[in-house]
C-alpha cells in the first residue's frame, strides 16, 4: 500500500498543484515535496527503496529543480520521456542479457517460466518506449492543461490496460507455486 501511495501521491500532488495552486510551477513544487516525503517514508518504514524509485526521484529532482529555477516547464514535461527511455533500456537490456529485471520486481507475486520473464521484459520495454513517444507527442502538441490531464487520466489507464494485457501470458506460464 505504501509503495502504491508513494507512486500515486506525487501525481495527485502535481495535479492538485496545477489546477488549484496556479500552474506548472506550483505543480512541480508540490510534486517535488511529495516525492521526497514519500521516498523518505518508504525508507523509514521499509528500510529500503527500490532502484526504480531512486532513479525516478533523482530525475524528478533534477528536472523539477531546473523547471523551478528557469521557469521553463519543458524540463518537467520531458521528465516522463527520460524515465520511460531509461526504464525501456533497463528492461530491454535485461531481456537481451537473459537476466530479466522484471523478475526481481514481481517474483514475490508471480513465479513464471524463465522464458516468460524474458518475454515480459521485452513487452515492458516496448511499453515504456511507446509511452516515451506518446509523452513527447502530447507535451509538444497540446496545452499544459491537456498534458497534465493526460498524465493523470491517460497514463494511469494506459498502464492498467498494459498490465491487463499481460495477464494471459502470466496465467498461461505461471509455475504451480505461484500466488496468482
UniProtKB/Swiss-Prot annotation:
GO cellular component: plasma membrane
Record keywords: Cell inner membrane, Cell membrane, Membrane, Transmembrane, Transmembrane helix
Membrane spanning stretches: 4-24, 25-45, 52-72, 76-96, 118-138, 150-170
Top-level taxonomic group: Bacteria
InterPro entries given in the database record: YciB (IPR006008)
Bilayer topology term: Multi-pass membrane protein
Localization: Cell inner membrane
Disulphide connectivity of cysteines: none
Family to which this protein belongs: Belongs to the YciB family.
NCBIfam families registered for this protein in UniProt: ispZ, PRK00259.1-1
Function: Plays a role in cell envelope biogenesis, maintenance of cell envelope integrity and membrane homeostasis.
Protein name in UniProt: Inner membrane-spanning protein YciB
Amino acid at each position: 500500500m505504501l509503495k502504491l501511495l508513494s507512486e500515486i501521491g506525487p501525481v495527485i500532488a502535481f495535479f492538485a498543484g496545477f489546477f488549484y495552486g496556479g500552474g506548472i510551477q506550483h505543480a512541480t513544487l508540490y510534486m517535488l515535496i511529495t516525492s521526497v516525503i514519500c521516498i523518505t517514508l518508504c525508507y523509514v518504514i521499509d528500510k529500503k527503496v527500490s532502484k526504480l524509485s531512486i532513479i525516478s526521484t533523482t530525475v524528478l529532482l533534477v528536472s523539477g529543480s531546473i523547471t523551478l529555477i528557469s521557469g521553463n516547464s519543458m524540463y518537467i514535461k520531458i521528465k516522463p520521456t527520460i524515465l520511460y527511455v531509461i526504464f525501456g533500456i533497463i528492461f530491454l537490456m535485461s531481456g537481451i542479457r537473459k537476466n530479466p529485471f522484471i523478475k526481481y520486481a514481481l517474483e514475490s507475486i508471480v513465479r513464471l517460466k524463465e522464458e516468460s520473464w524474458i518475454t515480459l521484459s521485452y513487452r515492458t520495454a516496448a511499453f515504456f518506449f511507446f509511452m516515451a513517444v506518446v509523452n513527447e507527442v502530447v507535451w509538444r502538441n497540446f496545452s499544459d492543461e491537456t498534458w497534465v490531464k493526460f498524465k493523470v487520466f491517460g497514463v494511469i489507464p494506459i498502464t492498467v490496460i498494459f498490465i491487463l494485457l499481460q495477464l494471459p501470458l502470466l496465467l498461461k506460464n505461471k509455475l504451480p507455486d505461484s500466488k496468482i
